[in-house]
Design a protein with these regions (language model features):
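FAD-site-proximal beta/loop scaffold in flavoenzymes
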Residues: 300-323, 409-479
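Residue-level detector of alpha-helix initiation sites
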Residues: 138, 202-203, 227, 332-334, ...
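N-terminal Rossmann-like FAD-binding beta1-loop-alpha1 element of flavoenzymes
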Residues: 196-218, 335-343
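Glycine-rich dinucleotide-binding loop and its adjacent helix/turn
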Residues: 173-189, 248-268, 291-345, 450-460, ...
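A conserved short coil-to-beta-strand element within the FAD-binding core of flavoproteins
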Residues: 262-273, 381-392
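Ferredoxin-type iron-sulfur electron-transfer modules and their immediate structural context
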Residues: 1-195, 243, 282-300, 389-393, ...
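Rossmann-like dinucleotide-binding cores of NAD(P)H-dependent redox enzymes
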Residues: 218-221, 225-256, 260, 312-314, ...
Length: 652
């Protein structure tokens, strides 16, 4: 059959007259969007995304259903076509309902594929679980113990019974791997010959080091402490985070060749001028290790110590005895850690004094509960006004508080109750009312510093005002969670890698994300389909066993418990997220979200026939129906249906 000549986007092409415009375009590497087209099917759908313009005829036609003809002039892309396609896509998206990413994954500052590693544990694939975790969190043993788990707050399992113990499962994977004959090591690219200096051996700096080393770059880590780990080592007590766990997480970084310059203060012992002689870039990742002042008389009296200093001395084995009576001032994790540490150092009475209510205490609620179980007393709505030296120790003058109107931060302001003054005696007062960043700017002349003392960086590149100098972690965000520093460390490593390889910095493209919305907003049948199963308790020492011991208080899951807990996961993450054509097209057309999506009809997930069909994700493209109709037997292999579904409505 004689070929026909036509013009597509100004290009003259010669094709068989049996082809559609869409097939002719694809044959010539011209892309036309479509959801309902499948090359193996004779019958076509009607998504109207493949609409094109016939020039000279002022006609808009579907490219998948229109045969080519001699002399045809086709335009596949212009502003009018894009507008029409976007309208069609928005109509289709309105029919599509479900979560692209699980709420747990969205809430994780590091962006960890939580459903992925939990599923791997549930099916006994420990190595796969570790590999998935290490894609975003290279310190899993540490974070599996100390992360406050915003992911668990977001877990949709709340709508059934209790959230999945995500952190404990991450710890399980890390501990299993650490005990394996050959622990996980990432594949490392060929050496680039480039070298990066990292100032700070805390979560952000270690994370950046891990990914830069894996990318083939050399890394030198500079830190003022004797050992790496930053506040994870010197600010978190050993009964929560054993030193051997820190070493286990750092092992891959050492084995990939990182150089450590410990007991080295940046700015006094070395600076960027010196380091730049044999380093191509620098990352500043210092933590918030300076104690905030309380602003009351007597806070510098003998017997008053900051929470940071107290925990550091305890980590170094130099804290001495705490005395019989200890008062800790503050309500964060440092305050709770200091109180629990004081008990283990022999204190008979430990009191946490906090100026707001229990609901507003920023410390992890689990840690507060464990402290209370060990015998720590909470004196809430109480604030110190003065600390005085006394022949028998210290006197803490305090006042009762009430909560007033919300301040600029949205929190209700504590107000002193007139005439409520009282005095408490103490042998030791630990001040843990906050932390601040002290950037070693003397080592980086010209570094831009904000009024709050944090470093100014470009939001996209994380580069400072100094070329080749980047920053991440607390020195950028202010005092924050370790998991946030991990997320920033990975982003910084990616940006530095682009800098070292000469690639331009690029803002990540906006990605479409369909979601049922907030944690409890999925359709009722979504929760009802799950069988109730109580959260598996994480084994721990009893309060009487642990209150005088620095042995790790929480002992962690064994295999049976871990698998049982992992199987509670609802697997909210779409199974087709990496191959969803609808998500890809939505991103191309700048449609970034479909929040609070709801099924038009009855919610249904059917997994009884060997494949899983989720009706609410179906956009009626018709590919599966046409596949079955075209098959001579009226049946088709599920794998064919799964691979051809453009939205993940059919999955394995």
């Amino acid at each position: 059959m004689k070929p026909v000549q036509l013009t597509i986007d100004g290009r003259s092409v010669s094709v068989s007259p049996e082809l559609s415009i869409l097939e002719a375009a694809r044959l010539n590497d011209i892309s036309i969007p479509t959801l309902c087209f499948h090359e193996a099917l004779a019958e076509r759908g009607s998504c109207w995304l493949c609409i094109v313009e016939l020039k000279g005829q002022n006609r808009f036609i579907p490219a998948c259903n229109t045969k080519v003809s001699e002399g045809m002039v086709v335009e596949t892309d212009n502003a009018e076509l894009r507008g029409m396609r976007r309208q069609s896509l928005e109509r289709i998206i309105d029919q599509h309902c479900g979560d692209c990413l699980g709420p747990c994954e969205i809430s994780c500052p590091a962006g960890c594929n939580i459903p992925g590693f939990v599923s791997a544990i549930a099916t006994g694939r420990d190595r796969d679980a570790m590999a998935i975790i290490m894609e975003t969190i290279p310190l899993p043993g540490i974070l599996g113990r100390v992360c406050p788990a915003p992911c668990e707050d977001a877990c949709r399992r709340h709508g059934v019974d209790d959230p999945v113990s995500i952190c404990a499962l991450k710890r399980f994977a890390a501990d299993r791997d650490a005990a394996a004959p050959e622990p996980f090591m990432p594949e490392r690219k060929v050496g680039s010959g480039k070298k990066v200096a990292i100032v700070g051996a805390g979560p952000g700096g270690l994370t950046a080091a891990y990914y830069l080393l894996a990318a083939g770059h050399g890394v030198t880590i500079i830190d003022a402490h004797e050992q790496p780990g930053g506040m994870m080592r010197y600010g978190i007590p050993r009964f929560r985070l054993p030193a051997e766990v820190i070493e286990s997480d750092i092992r891959p970084i050492r084995e990939m060749g990182a150089e450590f310059m410990m007991s080295t203060s940046f700015g006094s012992d070395t600076d960027w001028t010196t380091l730049s002689r044999d380093h191509d870039s620098l990352l500043l990742s210092v933590g918030a290790s300076v104690a905030a002042r309380m602003g009351i008389p007597g806070e510098d009296a003998p017997g008053v110590v900051s929470g940071i200093e107290f925990l550091k001395r305890a980590a170094e084995g130099d804290a001495g005895e705490a005395g019989k009576t200890v008062i800790v001032i503050g309500g964060g994790n440092t305050a709770v850690d200091a109180a629990r540490t004081a008990l283990r150092l022999g204190a008979e009475s430990v009191t946490i004094m906090y100026r707001r209510s229990l609901e507003e205490m920023p410390a992890n609620s689990l840690e507060i509960g464990e402290a209370s179980a060990e015998g720590v007393e909470l004196r809430l709505l109480t604030a110190p006004t003065e600390i005085c030296s006394d022949p028998e120790g210290l006197l803490v003058r305090a006042v009762e508080m009430r909560l007033g109107e919300p301040g600029v931060d949205g929190r209700r302001r504590p107000i002193a109750v007139e005439g409520s003054d009282f005095v408490l005696k103490a042998d030791l007062v630990i001040a843990a009312t906050g932390q601040a960043v002290q950037v070693p700017a003397s080592g980086l002349p010209g570094l831009g510093i904000r009024q709050d003392g944090t470093v100014m960086v470009d939001e996209v590149s994380m580069q400072t005002e100094l070329p080749g100098v980047f920053a991440c972690g607390d020195c950028v965000s202010g005092p924050e969670l370790a998991i946030l520093a991990v997320g920033q460390g990975r982003r910084a490593a990616q940006a530095i890698d682009r800098f070292l390889t000469g690639l331009p910095f690029e803002k990540p493209p906006a990605v479409f994300n369909s979601s049922y919305g907030e944690r409890d907003h999925a359709p009722a049948p979504f929760y009802e389909r799950a069988k109730p199963a109580s959260r598996v308790d994480v084994p721990e020492l009893s309060p009487s066993e642990r209150r005088r011991s620095f042995e790790e208080a929480v002992t962690g899951y064994g295999r049976e418990d871990a698998v049982s807990e992992a199987r509670r996961c609802l697997q909210c993450r779409c199974r087709a997220i990496d191959s969803c054509h609808l998500r890809e097209l939505a991103g191309e057309f700048g449609i970034t979200s479909s929040m609070e999506s709801r099924p038009d009809g009855e919610f249904a997930i059917d997994g009884t026939q060997g494949a899983r069909f989720e009706r609410e994700k179906c956009v009626d493209c018709g590919i599966c129906v046409r596949t079955l109709e075209q098959a001579s037997s009226g049946t088709a292999d599920f794998r064919v249906l799964i691979e051809s579904c453009p939205t993940g409505a059919i999955s394995g």
